Amino acid sequence: MSARPAQPNIYAPIRTSLSGYPSPTHSGSSTPASLEFSDGRLPENNVERDMSKVVERVALLGEADEGAVIVEGEDKVTKFVWMLVSAAAISGLLFGYDTAAISGMLVIIKDDLGTILSSWQKEVITSATTLGALLGGLAAGCVSDFTGRRLVIVFANVAFIGGSICQAACHTVAAMIAGRFIVGLGVGLASCIVPLYIGELAPTMIRGRLVTINCVAVTLGQVVAYAIGASFQNVHNGWRWIVGLGAMPSFVQLAAIGFLPESPRILLLRSDVAGARAITAKIYPLATIEQVDRKIEIMKAAVDQSIEYNANSTWFERLKSLVMVGTNRRALIIGCGLQAAQQLCGFNTLMYYSATIFAMLGFNNATAVGLIVATVNVLFTLVALKIVDPVGRRRTMLFTLPIMILALVFAAIFFYYLTLSTNGILIEDHDYPRSLSILVLLSMLLYVAGYATGLGNIPWQQGELFRLEVRGIGTSICTAVNWSCNMLIAGTFLSLMDAATPSGAFGIYAGFCVIGWVFCWMLYPETSGLSLEEVYFVFEEGFGIKKSQQLRKQKLVEAAKLKAIFE
């Protein structure tokens, strides 16, 4: 094998990932020398001036993250990274399973809880999980800086196991609500902390794809829930097996948790520099010692700044800074807006009530039909895994939301004609035209395809929006917004179908999608391929849509040049 060519020295003392951009030189002073390019010229255009500001901030404030240094093998996923992402994503599997299991359970539970469940009781049972997830999500980000990310994952698994056992053994509606609430705590903890954990361990160039793996696990969990639900449709007390089996993956993850590393940033917060360096070296096995040290040095600068900030501020002051500091506020608006859009589009009505809807439409095994919907969700989440980094977050959202809008409009139209004979209301055991029922199903599949490719996973990239000292609080608030909107949707869907008709309900969801598209078009910058410090810089003066696109374009060009050196 030929010798590896020497890597150009583009990393000292601190550089951005753009080898052509200026690097400050230190000569015993903390103040950088004049910023200039390697050929001696000064920045000329807007992009170059913007990037010179990035470098100057890195030099003066130490605000860069480790993504500001590109190393050899940056765009490769090693076995170690695959192992830790796969193990962490088991929480995503549980998240998906426990939110989808309710769909198959509701159609076969009958009077096993002492009464035939009314629409209101079904909504309360479903919403109990969402309320638990709301509280769990709020708690996760707030405590994870103190406990570490791994311990929060342990707490989530304990909740998954306890809630599953409680549901499987319950004999009253109140006990079922309690079990769903406990499971919801686990869902909230997992939904907040796992994307954050993966994002902090992932190399910058593939961060989006690795976080999306957790979304793939969520959709896979939904498929498993529908498959198990379909298998137990005709089994006495089969619903107890459906909810009880949800505990099994938790035992697997608890066994694997000892092999998962803590986030290097958490280790640096604990002054464990050696531990952080060892984990970083495993993540970047092709990197030189100098490159690993440089990443640790830059990470430590950001962590030290956060420690100093935290030492001189209370938790409430950091919470206040999310609203009062412009860069933090804009990041919070983006994160909360995307999470609200993810739920208000109505997708989880399919996850919670698809079996109920398809049973009313006349499909014999409604849970099996729901399995088709969940499978499409998995397939197009895999598409998202492929495109989320190279195509970009913003472009993906702007392309897929119109697909969702179109599909929801189709569904509203088909529901209108489908229910003409029943005064616009879906009625059980009514013989609806099979052709229109199939058209409703097809429109929902198109809707799910659009959702899974964009809105289903991109909001969970929220960790990249916030600086370290407010990242835990920021992601908690965004996750809480997600589950608050989820609770609104889950707790009103059946009632909305009765009050506004199915056609009206899906028309309302289409309207929310239109608002979401306008939000993304006006406010959402492109964060794909940018280091965490660069994302922060983008928000310094407005929402930085054009600035982010310019930075990303230039970084892609420079990354291609660097890659060509080693080919």
Swiss-Prot record:
Region Disordered: start-end pairs: 14-42
Keywords associated with the record: Cell membrane, Glycoprotein, Membrane, Transmembrane, Transmembrane helix, Transport
Entry's Gene Ontology molecular function annotations: transmembrane transporter activity
Protein's recorded name: Myo-inositol transporter 1
Compartment annotation: Cell membrane
Catalytic activity entry: myo-inositol(out) + H(+)(out) = myo-inositol(in) + H(+)(in)
GO cellular component, one term: plasma membrane
Topological type in the membrane: Multi-pass membrane protein
Pfam family, one: Sugar_tr
Entry function: May function as a transporter or as a sensor for myo-inositol.
Gene name linked to the record: ITR1
Cytoplasmic compartment segments: 1-88, 145-150, 202-209, 262-343, 389-397, 457-476, 525-567
Induction, as annotated: Induced during sexual reproduction. Expressed during infection of host.
Glycoprotein recorded as keyword: yes
GO biological process, one term: myo-inositol transport
Consequence of gene disruption: Increases RNA level of ITR3, ITR3B, and ITR3C. Reduces mating hyphae production; conjugation appears normal. Simultaneous disruption of INO1 leads to an exacerbated mating and sporulation defect, and attenuates virulence in a murine inhalation model of systemic infection.
Polar residues compositional bias, start-end: 16-33
